[in-house]
Amino acid sequence: MWKLTRRLQPHINSTRWLVRNFRNGGAGDATGLYGFDHLKTAKGFQRFVADAIERSGELVSYISGMPSSPEIIKAMDEISDTVCCVVDSAELCRQTHPDREFVEEANKAAIEMNDYLHHLNTNHTLYAAVKKAEQDSNLLTKEASRTAHHLRMDFERGGIHLDPEKLDKVNNLTTNIFQLCREFSENIADDPGHVDIFPGSRIPRHLHHLLNPTYRSTSGGSRGSTRSAHKSKQKGFRINTDPRTVSSILQWTSDEEVRKMVYIQGNSVPHANHGVLEKLIAARHELSQMMGCNSYADIMVEPNLAKSPKVVTSFLQELSKTVKPKADEEFIAIRDFKREKCGNPSAELEPWDETYYTSMMKSSINDVDTAVVASYFPLPQCIEGLKVLVESLFGATFHTIPLAPGESWHPNVVKLSLHHPDEGDLGYLYLDLYSRKGKYPGCASFAIRGGRKISETEYQLPVIALVCNFSRACDSSIVKLNHSEVEVLFHEFGHALHSLLSRTDYQHFSGTRVALDLAEMPSNLFEYYAWDYRLLKRFARHYSTGETIPEKLVNSLQGARNMFAATEMQRQVFYALIDQMLFGEQPETARDVSHLVAELKRQHTSWNHVEGTHWYIRFSHLLNYGAGYYSYLYAKCFASTIWQSICEEDPLSLNTGTLLREKFFKHGGAKDPAELLTDLAGKEIISVHGEGIVPATTYLLNELRL
């Protein structure tokens, strides 16, 4: 049925379930997690699920009476809203809550709601009602008609039109795919791998706080991780090879053997995901066959701008061909730099060298000291920067508001309201930005509640959580961000704003619920602001002196920004091609995935493949972006065009913000994605390619000097 990355709304008494279960009360009004009254305790997830199923059942009964078409669509949207409030709250809790009981109950809730979704997705009464509504001219708005059409298509992509036996198989496959995706993610979290390095002096001192000490006998005895070390024991470090730690080691460690060991281990675990990925590929392919498609990629790409995997592959191959000469030049430059630094004119350049030497080249050529840069980006000042940006562009202000007892999941969580002087509150944003054990390891924007029109006088405001993992340096009580972290913060803020500024009638199209290959455009667009001195000078101040960041330093940062743009572009094209290969048409005989990945790397990058490494077994984008990773490259092209043609001349003006909001943000997914883009930036932003649409690459390639 509907995609349940989406949400819904009611007919009569539409606020009854919501008011009973959600509050935005002040600090004195006790509530539950995220403002949901049910979630005062972990066990409350059970009641949360039960009430959502009960409310959805009432709405299904109402729809079965075939009311007017507008009421059918409203009720369908409420079912989605009701279910998604539980699903999304459970996902956020699962990823961020420090209490294990809450995490376990959230897991159970997610599984139970997923099972219930299968029941809804195979409900022929709902399907018949949606078909009736779609054909009815009484749907008075384009958004209502578009919602009806999308709901019908979502039903059919779920197999509602199949005979009962096939539909049962589709449901079983869908459940299996859900479980495999969860297993893949859990394996990554549970088995990051590790490498023990002796002596500890081989690791730079400023990284020691990221690592656990370990000891061994100087005579070569057994190793242990206790601190009961005598003088006969040698201290080393156990490096957990999770992506964040691996990145730090590869950037800062001069010892090539250490980098090599960490690179290989970090790109070889978790071993269990080899089998999980094989099963996932097979299950998704079988699902596509049941649905009458050639591949899972066909299913996933068809609703998007690209329309066809052939269009995607053609776009990627053309991009690969365009950037290869420049990428080869960059590779030679890095290799020559390594040879000079290590005094070996025949030294070969290996993948574990890339981050170390490119960072060194950027710093030396552009006089950029990352520690100096970070001193101008204490986290509280970066939050001020987001506030300055929103006020400049949209005339809206963020205000810190008190959290009600029971609403928060950690003492570090902050809640903001986005307020407009003429429109009132636009939505709510939780900030959970500090690193802690057991928390989601990356940065992401999580929806908690989507926006939707409840009546002519009432609008359900969106609620979003922005989650990051910023940590203090070992010698500081202040969290200071390196510039890449500032860029990530602005990226995720772009996603959050997409939801907060959306004003759709139906939550089905609220905010980021757009075509997959358009969804990353706002986040990529807002990355540009992290580089623009016109904004940076208004918030980036030295953590101890208060000095504004020097323009010369920002110019140096910008000089380093695109030094290896072709290499990075190659990497993204390579990832996207792997994604298409894994979930594209499958041969009759089993494939050696590792061999195919190695071959694609040789064809589309300038770097060696390291035998025995399998980085893709921890590439979680294969789960939620399966056959859709190309969307990041689409988004980069769209964002570059929009930045240069609309924002760059006057990036902080209310006129620029009004154009972005009125032409793009407020519509969410309620308008055709191609129409959204051309209304904002003109027809040159896209071009028709075969049966689909591809982005214009001119602006991006010029920006990157490719």
UniProtKB/Swiss-Prot annotation:
Record-listed Zn(2+) binding positions: 491, 495, 520
Function: Aminopeptidase which cleaves preproteins, imported into the mitochondrion, to their mature size. Could cleave both preproteins and preprotein intermediates already cleaved by the mitochondrial processing peptidase (MPP).
Molecular function, one GO term: metal ion binding
Family of the protein in this entry: Belongs to the peptidase M3 family.
Record has Protease as a keyword: yes
Alphabetical list of InterPro entries matching this protein: M3A_MIP, MetalloPept_cat_dom_sf, Neurolysin/TOP_dom2, Pept_M3A_M3B, Pept_M3A_M3B_dom
GO BP term (any one): proteolysis
Residue ranges of the region described as Disordered: 212-238
Superkingdom of source: Eukaryota
Protein localization: Mitochondrion
Protein name per UniProt: Mitochondrial intermediate peptidase, mitochondrial
UniProt cofactor note: Binds 1 zinc ion.
EC primary class: hydrolase
Origin species: Arabidopsis thaliana
Coiled coil ranges: none
The protein's Enzyme Commission number: 3.4.24.-
Xref: PANTHER family: MITOCHONDRIAL INTERMEDIATE PEPTIDASE, PROTEASE M3 THIMET OLIGOPEPTIDASE-RELATED
Gene Ontology cellular component annotations, sorted alphabetically: chloroplast thylakoid membrane; mitochondrion
Keyword annotations: Hydrolase, Metal-binding, Metalloprotease, Mitochondrion, Protease, Transit peptide, Zinc
Signal sequence residues: none
Residues of the active site: 492
Claim: Transit peptide is one of the keywords in the record: yes
Effects seen without this gene: No visible phenotype.
Transit peptide: 1-29
Pfam families: Peptidase_M3
